[in-house]
A protein has these predicted regions:
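Conserved GNAT-fold acetyl-CoA-binding loop/helix
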Residues: 50-77
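Conserved acetyl-CoA-binding loop-helix of GNAT-fold acetyltransferases
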Residues: 127-140, 163-167
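Conserved beta-strand-loop-alpha-helix junction that forms the acyl-donor binding cleft
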Residues: 152-162
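C-terminal "cap" of GNAT-fold acetyltransferases
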Residues: 178-224
Length: 224
């Protein structure tokens, strides 16, 4: 923790043939191996995160926003999460290729052990395992913070995202038809759930990120 802010800790993640392992070397050893760095996001990352998100809101039904919000509003939205929930970026050679964060799933206090996942990957970097790396890190951090359930709400027609979530351990728990209207059509929403721990693991309210990183300053064991 530096000056009351969470430091930009990171872990290097090697992707080879679809597998994930932590690695402290720099560079790419062979063509089929990509080296990514997953780290805590900071205010300096927000412009890159905004540019990744903007096409999702402007051009797709992945986001139910009718266009990206003003950059300042987006920055305020992300900044409000930093001290409480994990907000991560995945970069390669200093370029942010994707980001993910957790946020409250519901408002009432009894839901405090539930969080909602959001993952966004730059269009040219999709299909390279970045979403899996980010999801794994978010889930691992939430488990350490003391969360029990992680949810993701996916537009029904986004079948690739539904398949992705099922591949990384989520199960469909609900489907709500015609919940949103965008781009001239009604859209159903699939609710997916990942259980992070059993009912006995959550005797206290979850920690905040700022509390976790007072005691533990590294992301390395997330991928241990």
């Amino acid at each position: 923790m530096e000056n009351g802010r969470i430091s930009s800790n990171h872990v290097r993640v090697k992707m080879k043939n679809g597998s994930i392992s932590s690695n402290q070397d720099s560079g790419i050893e062979e063509k089929e191996t990509a080296m990514y760095k997953v780290r805590l996001a900071n205010a300096g990352d927000i412009p890159a995160m905004y540019e990744i998100y903007r096409p999702y809101a402007d051009e797709t039904t992945v986001s139910f926003e009718y266009g990206a919000p003003p950059a300042g509003d987006f920055a305020a939205r992300i900044s409000a999460l930093f001290s409480v929930y994990p907000v991560l970026v995945c970069e390669e050679y200093g370029q942010v290729l994707g980001y993910a964060y957790a946020a409250p799933a519901f408002e009432r206090r009894a839901y405090a052990w539930c969080a909602e996942l959001s993952v966004y990957v730059e269009s040219s970097a999709r299909g390279r395992g970045i979403g899996s790396v980010l999801e794994r890190a978010i889930a691992a951090l939430l488990k350490r913070l003391g969360y029990r359930k992680l949810y993701s709400l996916v537009t029904q027609e986004n079948t690739a995202s539904v398949a992705f979530h099922e591949h990384v351990g989520y199960r469909q728990v609900a489907f709500f038809p015609e919940q949103g209207y965008k781009m001239g059509r009604w859209l159903g929403v699939v609710w997916l759930e990942k259980e992070l721990c059993d009912a006995g693991c959550c005797e206290k309210f979850p920690l905040k990120m700022i509390e976790l990183f007072d005691a533990d300053r590294t992301l390395e064991e997330v991928f241990g």
